[in-house]
Regions:
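N-terminal acidic, glycine/proline-rich low-complexity segments
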Residues: 1-258
């Protein structure tokens, strides 16, 4: 089987304190277990936690998975989100893609600073990326976290020539992970998620509470469990045929902030 080579730009936080989500980690585990995918590296960004914590989380997650062969690079932080400032992550991203032009798919699961920085310093990079899959954005007015964390970076990426697939927040609302799914995982002790079930259960309870409050303002958000946002974008890499009604749109950012 020819594996699809990918780079993952990510802000994982399941294994560290002071994190706001665990969906990046679940998406990475999903892709690690997928024979169709070859992960060439992880570039870490801020978002669900600080850059120091997301970097530590990524290293620990790959150690748990026995995949220390996959390199991990530290990128921008909340206080260093400047596309004019190169980082280890932005350099690795650009160098890896440019060594294999037209081959390496990029998956972004957090704010887009690292990719925007790579594009700023390597103008030929956009032509070398065959596909960019992003978890981010929304179709109705209002900010989505990944794009809203650094609007200028998001706008730079959106206006680039890279072929893009945007997995929006509304799309992810169609796939809640419920207590019933967790019970099925508990019945499979061989599952690679087994060791993480306690933290997943805690997050399910917390996110159900959070969304019960948000639903007062946005009643269209379905009830159920929690939403594994980034796992939906990862699923697109495995099998795009799972997705219907794909729309071709021109997308950009308005009211761009810092």
């Amino acid at each position: 089987m020819n594996k699809k080579p990918i780079l993952i730009d990510t802000d994982p936080g399941m294994l560290v304190r002071l994190s706001t989500d665990l969906d990046d980690d679940l998406a990475i585990l999903f892709l690690l277990a997928s024979p169709e995918i070859a992960i060439l590296g992880l570039t870490c960004t801020y978002g669900n936690s600080s850059i120091a914590r997301t970097f530590a989380d990524a290293k620990t997650l790959l150690e748990h998975a026995g995949r220390q062969d996959i390199p991990v690079f530290k990128g921008a932080g909340w206080r260093t989100r400047d596309v004019n400032r190169e980082t280890d992550a932005s350099r690795f991203l650009a160098e890896t893609v440019l060594k294999r032009p037209g081959e390496v798919t990029v998956l972004t699961l957090g704010p887009l600073t690292n990719l925007a920085t790579a594009l700023t310093h390597h103008p030929d990079l956009a032509e070398a990326i065959p596909e960019l899959v992003m978890m981010g954005g929304r179709l109705r007015p209002g900010a989505e976290f990944n794009f809203g964390a650094h609007p200028k970076a998001a706008d730079l990426v959106l206006r680039s020539a890279i072929p893009k697939v945007m997995v929006t927040i509304e799309l992810c609302f169609q796939a809640p992970l419920t207590a019933a799914e967790l019970r099925r995982l508990e019945d499979r002790p061989d599952s690679h998620l087994a060791r993480y079930l306690p933290v997943i259960r805690r997050w399910l309870r917390l996110q159900r509470f959070i969304f019960s409050l948000i639903r007062l303002r946005y009643p269209e958000i379905p009830a159920g469990g929690f939403f594994p946002w980034d796992g939906i974008a990862a699923a697109y890499l495995i099998d795009p045929s799972l997705f219907s009604e794909i729309k071709v749109l021109q997308v950009w950012m308005e009211k761009i902030g810092p």
